[in-house]
Amino acid sequence: MKKLTFISCLLLSGCLAGAMAANKKQPIYKDAKAPIEERVNDLVSRMTLEEKVQQLNQYTLGRNNNENNRGEEVKKIPATLGSLIYFDEDANLRNEAQRKAMEESRLGIPILFGYDVIHGFRTIYPISLGQACSWNPQLVEQACAVAAQEARMSGVDWTFSPMIDVARDGRWGRVAEGYGEDPYTNAVFGVASIKGYQGEDMSDSKRVAACLKHYIGYCASEAGRDYVYTEISNQTLWDTYIPPYEAGVKAGAATLMSSFNDISGTPGSANHYTMTEILKNRWKHDGFVVSDWSAVPQLIDQGHAADRKEAA
């Protein structure tokens, strides 16, 4: 840069250079070296209400197998969307959706891709109930680690597993997804699964985030019917259904899934006692909770909300 003759010009140049540098300064939330809490607080402070609402939404991607329509699928995804249930194997489709979020949204928040990795991804293992029969949690941890690596290589960041519902009614149709009727067994294998999926560091390219489900009492539905009422006393809640979740949260589970069912009259997805008083206040869980499929609009059917706005 040429030496300027006049001091006034030199000062002006310095001011302009400083302003340009300030404009180019990276936001705290994009600084990988900054503490997580600072990055989160900075990002949230920049978000509009609409952007926050979009981050709470989850769409599906990849259910349309017609390749000619895949571009249309991506067009339907808001750039500010929070997460996708990813049903496909097309890396180009997945990457195009992510590119849209990163480049076409104001803040460039990446999409979280989730999938039901239950008992393996490409390599299939025995169902969870069968795994419990082995009483070999170390082997289950290894199996979940393999599933995590396969899923991550396919573009999945987050699995809706493990299911640790303490199921004691054989009529319930999802008994096979859990680890049986004993709270301790569910706790042990749930923790093993979490360790396998997440490892020591979820930023590892071979790991995925785990999700404890279904919080809570989903398996205790009347007559084993899905989506219906449960009558659970506080003692039964704590003696039978709480222990596996408490163990899973203490083991570092990144997320939980709220259940469809009422818990003695209050829907699981709108239950202040279980979601806030226990999970957040008592256990200090700092991850997030995802509702089960359409469980939030179902609050209308359960008589808990008048419309979708109130349900949300």
Identify the residue ranges that each predicted region occupies.
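Glycoside hydrolase catalytic-domain context in secreted enzymes
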Residues: 18-312
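Bacterial Sec-dependent N-terminal signal peptides
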Residues: 1-25
